[in-house]
């Protein structure tokens, strides 16, 4: 009898996938290390966004996964991809563009093909798309450093 093993995407949030162990910059590319599996959790709710955020001297870069289409960088936007964005004082996205590429491997999240000199802060977060106001805002910060 032939058995086939099927591996499904993780359907539950594992917060260790967003707990920051270390962060820095190599050759102008910001990176962070998590305690769990980088990119191991992806949102199952169409209005949610999971994000690894890098605040740099050249803007804020965000490696994110979500169910709605907003980039040509990846075929399916639940795949981790990078945007450069601006948040307002309510932590809502006011400007977003495709800038930078993404490397997610084991416990590492890295933004590539950008030039930054320093990373002043990193944080991991959940954002939510509000269809009524057409806004996407941070609803939960999982972890931050420093």
Each language-model region and where it sits:
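Surface-exposed, acidic/Ser/Thr-rich flexible loop segments
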Residues: 55-57, 101-103, 108, 117-119
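Surface-exposed, glycine/proline- and aromatic-rich loop segments on solvent-exposed faces
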Residues: 12-84
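Short, solvent-exposed, Trp/other aromatic-anchored flexible loops in extracytoplasmic proteins
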Residues: 81-83, 87, 113-116
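Beta-strand elements of well-folded, non-transmembrane domains
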Residues: 36-38, 88, 117
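Short helix-loop boundary/capping segments
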Residues: 88-107, 112
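Beta-strand secondary-structure signal
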Residues: 29-33, 110-112, 126
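Acidic/polar low-complexity flexible segments
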Residues: 118-146
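N-terminal low-complexity, Pro/Thr/Ser-rich intrinsically disordered segments
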Residues: 1-11
